[in-house]
């Protein structure tokens, strides 16, 4: 490929800095899985001002197979009304409900995903997607906007209706 060793090292350093590669002293450099603590929340970087690393928790609310709404079909590059899987979960940090998560998956790729399999899974979802379905999430495009808390946020996050929240739309 006619690339200098220094250029390759610099590229590896940059990939390691972004947690796309992991270095293990005495063993080498590896592509991490989503089950490794350092990359478990690769696309979610929430750290309190004091730097404390909170204990995380995940509660599955439900999992359904549905026809893709137009907006979801467009994001996932599917035909309108294609089958999708929607997983709803609540993420907590130090016992505090923090994130109400809607995860949309192409139904054809994730055929074995249903409420029973999601609830039976005890590994991080992205790690499960890698191991069980051969789908690695290595990149994400995000759009963030301010929204007023609606009924589901009020119910699951325990915030007053209308409270300003951040909504993150991520395609990974």
Model-derived regions, located:
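Extended hydrophobic
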Residues: 140-171
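HTH-adjacent hinge/linker in prokaryotic transcriptional regulators
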Residues: 1-2, 6-84, 110-139, 152
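A short acidic/small-residue loop/turn micro-motif
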Residues: 105-107
């Amino acid at each position: 490929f006619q690339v200098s060793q220094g250029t390759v090292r610099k590229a590896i350093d940059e990939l390691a800095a972004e947690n796309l590669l992991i270095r293990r002293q005495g063993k080498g450099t590896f592509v991490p899985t989503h089950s490794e603590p350092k990359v478990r929340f690769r696309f979610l970087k929430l750290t309190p001002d004091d730097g404390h690393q909170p204990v995380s928790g995940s509660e599955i609310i439900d999992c359904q197979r549905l026809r893709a709404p137009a907006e979801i079909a467009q994001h996932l590059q599917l035909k309108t009304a294609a089958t999708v899987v929607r997983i709803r979960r609540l993420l907590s940090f130090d016992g505090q409900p923090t994130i109400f998560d809607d995860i949309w998956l192409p139904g054809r790729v994730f055929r074995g995903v249903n409420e029973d399999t999601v609830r039976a899974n005890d590994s991080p979802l992205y790690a499960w997607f890698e191991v069980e379905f051969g789908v690695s999430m290595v990149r994400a495009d995000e759009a963030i906007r301010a929204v007023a808390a609606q009924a589901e946020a009020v119910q699951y996050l325990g915030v007053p209706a209308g409270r300003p929240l951040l909504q993150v739309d991520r395609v990974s």
